[in-house]
Regions:
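Short, well-ordered beta-to-alpha junction loops that form the rim of enzyme active sites
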Residues: 72-75, 154
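Active-site loop signature of alpha/beta-hydrolase-fold enzymes
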Residues: 30, 77, 183
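Generic enzyme active-site microenvironment
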Residues: 24, 72, 177
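Short glycine-enriched, charge-decorated loop/helix-capping segments at active-site entrances
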Residues: 37-47
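Acidic-leg catalytic submotif of subtilisin-like serine proteases
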Residues: 21-31
């Protein structure tokens, strides 16, 4: 059991490591570096880099408890074959046309070196805000009998929250770890976290990393 709001997680008190995964969303060079997509779009990546120690600590305790760690990476094919006209237009509008930003063939696509990725971790590549759209994430989760998801990563208001909403609609039990998520927009970050708890937890529950680690230690 993990102390959380508006209810302790999971709601029925049965937290089973083999049925639980820690999702680490998009902690890539393109989002966290000073020269990547996020910075070139006018956002400060400092808040995103700041969560790395917390995420690393969570991953360490999750693995020790027998919980699967799953990373996601956002990016497109090098030949842009999977990029829609609208996405190409947005890319051009942002001044990124002709660059390798957010392309899978670029260094920026890689997970940051300060992230403690382990060989047993699973990596899911995506092109959309949701890690479920056009990926094999749900198949991986169902194949492993995973029913409970712990959310971390960036950005809170876009890829984390979109994946969270889709997970809830797919009947996964979800917990968002507030201090293990980050955004370049403080208002959007706070709003996204607040939305988790409205209507008695319409998008699951919200906790901090210390509460999660304490709950895992008690298993």
């Amino acid at each position: 059991m993990i102390a959380a709001q508006p209810f302790n997680f999971p709601y029925d008190g049965r937290l089973v490591p083999a049925s639980t995964a820690l999702l680490v969303i998009d902690l890539q060079e393109d989002f966290l570096s000073n020269t990547g997509y996020f910075a070139r779009s006018g956002y400060d990546p400092t808040p995103l880099r700041a969560i790395l120690p917390t995420v690393n600590r969570l991953m360490k305790h999750a693995r020790a408890a027998g919980i699967q760690v799953i990373h996601t990476r956002q990016g497109y094919r090098g030949d842009l074959a999977d990029m829609t006209p609208y996405e190409k237009w947005r890319r051009q509008r942002a001044g990124l046309d002709g660059t390798d930003v957010l392309l899978r063939s670029s260094p920026g696509f890689q997970l940051v070196s300060d992230l403690d990725v382990s060989p047993e971790d699973i990596i899911v590549d995506k092109t959309c805000n949701s890690a479920f759209t056009y990926t094999d994430l749900e198949h991986i989760l169902r194949a492993r009998g995973i029913t409970h998801l712990l959310f971390s990563g960036c950005t809170t208001d876009v890829c984390v929250h979109t994946t969270l909403r889709e997970a809830c609609d797919r009947n996964f039990q979800c917990l968002t770890i507030a201090d293990a998520c980050a955004s370049g927009d403080a208002y959007a970050h706070a709003a996204a976290l607040h939305m988790v708890t409205v209507e008695n937890g319409i998008f699951g529950a919200l906790a901090d990393a210390d509460a999660v680690i304490a709950g895992l230690a008690a298993l």
